[in-house]
Amino acid sequence: MLEPSPYQDHKTWKMTPAMIRARQPFFKKNLMGLVILLGVTGTIYTYTYKMLNKDSDFADVPIPPIDEKELEQLKKEYELEKIRRAQK
């Protein structure tokens, strides 16, 4: 079992006032570091997401027209596949 440090209350495992006082000078700097770290990470993720959404590799490729016979055949194949998957 873990032994409590001298800076922890032995019954509740909470920080003692001495530990709280020792951490006070570093709180603002640590908080600013956290904000900067989260800001940079969030900015990178946002930038990457926006750049990837602009990607339109196939935007210039024309979609060929499909006639009604082919469309009906594709619908039948789709329905048969859907039924086959539902039976599994």
Curated annotation (Swiss-Prot):
**Membrane-spanning residues:** 31-49
Name the family the entry cites.
Belongs to the COA3 family.
* Function field: Required for assembly of cytochrome c oxidase (complex IV).
Which species does the entry assign this protein to? Kluyveromyces lactis (strain ATCC 8585 / CBS 2359 / DSM 70799 / NBRC 1267 / NRRL Y-1140 / WM37) (Yeast)
Topology in the lipid bilayer: Single-pass membrane protein
Any Gene Ontology biological process: mitochondrial cytochrome c oxidase assembly
Q: Does the keyword Transcription regulation apply?
A: no
A cellular component annotation (GO) from this entry: mitochondrial inner membrane
Provide the membrane-side ranges marked Mitochondrial matrix in the record. Answer: 1-30
Arranged from A to Z, the UniProt key words for this protein are: Membrane, Mitochondrion, Mitochondrion inner membrane, Transmembrane, Transmembrane helix
The UniProt entry, under InterPro entries, shows: Coa3
Does this UniProt record's set of keywords contain Mitochondrion?
yes
Assembly state and interactors?
A: Component of 250-400 kDa complexes called cytochrome oxidase assembly intermediates or COA complexes.
Please state what the protein is called: Cytochrome c oxidase assembly factor 3, mitochondrial
Residues exposed to the Mitochondrial intermembrane side? 50-88
Q: Where in the cell is it found?
A: Mitochondrion inner membrane
